[in-house]
Amino acid sequence: MMAVLTGLTLLAGVGCTKPIQGSAQPDPDAPLTQVSEDGYGLTAGFADAPVQIEIFAEPQCSHCADLQRDVGDGLAHYIGLGQLAVTYRPMTFLDTGDLGYSARVSNALFVAASQPDSPAVAFQRFVEALWADQDPSGRGPDDDEIAEKAGAAGLPEDVVGRIARGETAVDTVEMDAANYDLLYLVDPMYTGTPTVYNLNTDETVDIYDADWLDKLMSSA
């Protein structure tokens, strides 16, 4: 009897599973990432999401890293629910010498966004990872290191490979100039990063309010 019970216990603990062939497939209904119409922004989320914001950011900006640390999870959550679309507008004004740190990171973001099947939540996680591991005024991550972060964030293998190869996806000089001009238009008094702009109300967001994201989402 003990042997029978032991066998039953083992069966209950292990259970029966049906082998699944192949790899997990992305949700066809999940929000994706794309390059904005003007060519210099990166939009993560549905085009018809009820809340639309722009975030002006510099890859070496420590305050931008603080922003991602504080609300990165929240941004990913609302993007995944289809309630929020975030358009990132990278800038490179902290680049010095020939290192091209901010330009390299910005280009990698455009590589990811230009891939038709890049999941928006994975893109947001990629952004968080890049800003969480900064090297201000240093060399910054190389293409292989950036590609590793892209893979860990869940971006497609094609994106990871293109980043690792150093594929060019945007003219970062033109990108920086265009996004600076746009930042000046939305907030001529403070042309710094991070700046969050509410596209629904045409107003800058007070990101020093600890509950700004929740308030923004509840107002939609």
Language model features with spans:
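Extracytoplasmic thiol/disulfide redox context detector
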Residues: 1-97, 174-181, 215-220
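Short, flexible active-site loop motifs that bind/organize anionic cofactors or intermediates
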Residues: 6, 54, 136, 150, ...
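C-terminal cap of thioredoxin/glutaredoxin-like
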Residues: 19-21, 25, 151-220
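Short acidic/polar alpha-helix capping motifs at helix-coil junctions
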Residues: 36-42, 110-114, 160
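A broad, low-specificity signal for short, low-complexity segments enriched in glycine/proline
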Residues: 46-50, 72, 108-109, 155-160
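Structural alpha/beta surface segment adjacent to cysteine/selenocysteine redox centers
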Residues: 65-143
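Surface-exposed, polar/charged faces of alpha-helical domains
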Residues: 118-121, 144-151, 158-162
